[in-house]
Amino acid sequence: MQKHPTDSQNPWLELRRLTPARIALGRTGTSLPTDAQLDFQYAHAQARDAVHLPFDHAGLSAQLAERGRDSLLLHSAATDRHSYLQRPDLGRRLSDDSAQALRDYASAHPGGFDLAVVVADGLSALAVHRHTLPFLARMEEQTAAEGWSLSPVVLVEQGRVAVADEVGQLLGAKMTVILIGERPGLSSPDSLGLYFTYQPKIGLTDAYRNCISNVRLEGLSYGMAAHRLLYLMREACRRQLSGVNLKDEAQVQTLDSDEQADMKGNFLLGPPQA
C-alpha cells in the first residue's frame, strides 16, 4: 500500500502571489494546515470589526478642513448600528434634523452644484477612513480641470447608498457620487465603493446608478477610479442619464500593448509555443 505524506503543498502555490484569494492552502491529513485555519479566523474577525467600527466623521471633517474643504456632518434615519443593520430602509434616508439642516444650507447657498460629494460609513468605516482623502485628491484634480462645481463633502453617519439621492435632491445637484464602505470580504475589509447618479432624487433604484468597486491599494487605484468616474460624469452630462444605460467604456492605458499581451499567453499554461 502506497503511503502519502501527511503534509502536502498545493501545486498552485506559485499562483498565490497573483491574488489575495485563498488558493493553494495545502493540507494536513484531510484538513487545512493550522496556519491557514488561523489566518481564516483572523480575516473573519477583521471583517466583523470593520462592520462595527464607529465612523470617525469628526476626525475626517478636521482632515478635510486642513485641506481647505468644507464638510457637513449629517445622520441617516438609522439611530444606531443595530437599527442600521436590521433596517436597511432607514439608512437610505436622512434623519429629519439632518434633512432640515441640508435644506437650510441649500437656502443659504442657492444655485446648486454640478456634483454633490457624499461620504458614508456603509458596512466598513475602515474603508472610508483609509481611502476617502487620497481618492478625493485625485478626483478633485480632474473635476477642477472640467470646471465643475462641487458641494461641501457631506458626511453621513449610518448611511447607505441611496441616501446620496436625497442629499443631491436637497442640494439641487446635477449629479451625486457617494463614497461608501463596501461589505467586507475575507481578504478585503477596507474596500471602498463609488456610486454615481445623474439627476438624483428620492426613490431611485440601483438601475439608475453606476458603481465603481474595490477602490483600495490592493484593488482599483485612486487614479484609475477617478478616471472612470470622470468618464461616467462626462457621458452622463452628454447623454443625460446614468445607470444600466450608461456603460463604463473608459479607455485605460496599460503597461503592455495588445500585441505584447497576446504574446504572453495564458499565465496558467505558460508562454505560447512557437
From Swiss-Prot:
Keyword Lyase listed: yes
Cofactor requirements of the protein: adenosylcob(III)alamin
InterPro entries: EutC, EutC_C, EutC_N
Cofactor note: Binds between the large and small subunits.
GO MF entries: cobalamin binding; ethanolamine ammonia-lyase activity
Leading EC class: lyase
Enzyme nomenclature, EC number: 4.3.1.7
Subcellular location: Bacterial microcompartment
Keywords: Bacterial microcompartment, Cobalamin, Cobalt, Lyase
Record's catalysed reaction(s): ethanolamine = acetaldehyde + NH4(+)
Swiss-Prot/TrEMBL GO biological process terms: amino acid metabolic process; ethanolamine catabolic process
Binding sites annotated in the UniProt record for adenosylcob(III)alamin: 161, 182, 211
UniProt KW Lyase keyword: yes
Cellular-component GO terms for this entry: ethanolamine ammonia-lyase complex; ethanolamine degradation polyhedral organelle
Pathway the protein acts in: Amine and polyamine degradation; ethanolamine degradation
Superkingdom assignment: Bacteria
Pfam name, any one: EutC
Family: Belongs to the EutC family.
Record function comment: Catalyzes the deamination of various vicinal amino-alcohols to oxo compounds. Allows this organism to utilize ethanolamine as the sole source of nitrogen and carbon in the presence of external vitamin B12.
Entry-linked PANTHER family: ETHANOLAMINE AMMONIA-LYASE LIGHT CHAIN, ETHANOLAMINE AMMONIA-LYASE SMALL SUBUNIT
HAMAP family: EutC (MF_00601)
NCBIfam families (UniProt xref): PRK05465.1 (NF003971)
Subunit structure comment from the entry: The basic unit is a heterodimer which dimerizes to form tetramers. The heterotetramers trimerize; 6 large subunits form a core ring with 6 small subunits projecting outwards.
Official protein name in the record: Ethanolamine ammonia-lyase small subunit
Source species of the chain: Pseudomonas fluorescens (strain ATCC BAA-477 / NRRL B-23932 / Pf-5)
High-level lineage: Bacteria, Pseudomonadati, Pseudomonadota, Gammaproteobacteria, Pseudomonadales
